[in-house]
């Protein structure tokens, strides 16, 4: 099956942000985090991970800020309850292999669900003890409007601080 959204990956990335799967709005727009209620683009700008507020159709511009994008489930679109049953060991391996190949400094899951599904169990927000090669792994709160009840922007700010400290 074809990927709903193509990975935005290349060498020399500082960060790879990984969602669970493309939402239906993102799949239709062929752009990551495209739903108007999604806070993804605003939090990237608010935390100064991007110096400008990008729009979803500008997602390829993230490469100039050394940020890449992918999803845990590449072959499905929709809410987690629709896409997660499609998650396979091959999806986890594909992500690990991509991280090993491109070697970003950080892999950050953009939802607790994505991180927990990758690791196969309960996890807290923040930096994880495991690494993929030398890549540090974080679990961040979901930016989806459907997850407003668990929105914690301070964790995104902590992550951005760690990214800047790693560069500094």
Spans of features found by a protein language model:
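Short, surface-exposed acidic-centric catalytic microdomains
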Residues: 26-87
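Structural motif
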Residues: 14-15, 106
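C-terminal capping/extension of enzyme domains
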Residues: 3-14, 35-36, 43, 79-96, ...
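Short glycine-/acidic-enriched loop or helix-start segments at secondary-structure transitions
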Residues: 26-29, 117-120, 149-150
């Amino acid at each position: 099956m074809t990927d709903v959204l193509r990975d935005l990956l290349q060498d020399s990335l500082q960060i790879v942000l990984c969602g669970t799967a493309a939402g239906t709005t993102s799949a239709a727009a062929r752009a990551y985090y495209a739903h108007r209620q999604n806070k993804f683009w605003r939090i990237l700008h608010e935390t100064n991970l991007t110096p400008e507020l990008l729009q979803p159709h500008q997602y390829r511009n993230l490469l100039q800020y050394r940020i890449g994008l992918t999803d845990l489930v590449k072959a499905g679109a929709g809410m987690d309850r629709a896409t997660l049953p499609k998650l396979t060991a091959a999806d986890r391996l594909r992500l690990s292999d991509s991280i090993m190949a491109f070697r970003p400094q950080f892999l950050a899951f953009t939802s607790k669900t994505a991180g927990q599904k990758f690791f196969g169990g309960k996890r807290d927000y923040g930096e994880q003890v495991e690494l993929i090669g030398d890549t540090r792994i974080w679990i961040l709160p979901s930016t989806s409007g459907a997850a407003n009840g668990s929105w914690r922007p301070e964790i995104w700010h902590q992550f951005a601080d760690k990214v800047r400290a790693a560069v500094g």
